[in-house]
C-alpha cells in the first residue's frame, strides 16, 4: 500500500462481497459467503486496504450498496475496516430499480448502510441535504462519510498539491514507461488459470 501511495495511487478492492451479473441477484448461505466469498476481502482489510467498493447487485435480496449488515457489521465492526467505501458505478441510483426505495430515498439508504461515496449517480449531492433537513438522515453520518473521503484524499497528498498528479511529464515517466508496461504484461500473464486442458 505504501508503494501505491508514494506514487499517488489509492487502492480500491472490488466488489464486496459477490459479483452477480448487474441486475441479477446472488442467493447464498452465510456459510458459503463467509467461507468462500468474503475471505479475500477480509485479507485485503487485514493487509491495510484504504478503500473498498460495494457490489452493484442484490445479495440475498438486499442491494450490497445499501446493506448495513455487510458494510457496517461485517466490514467495519467484525473486521475493523476504517477506510472509505465507494459505491459501484451508479449503484445508489439503481437501488430504486430493485424496487427497494424511491430514487430520492436511495442515497439515505446507502449512507445509513455505510457507503461513504456515491460514484456517478449524483444522489448524495442532490438529495442528502434535504434528507438531513427533514430528519431522515443524521448529519453525523454525512460528517463521518465526508471524513473518510477526505482522509483518503489526505493520504494521496491532494491537500498539499491538488494538481500533483495532473502533470503531463508523468505520463511518459510513470504510465507509459516501458519497464512498467513490461511488468504489467508479466503480472497479467500470471493471472490466467487453465480450467480445462483438452
In which residue ranges do the predicted regions lie?
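Glycoside hydrolase catalytic-domain context in secreted enzymes
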Residues: 1, 7, 11-198
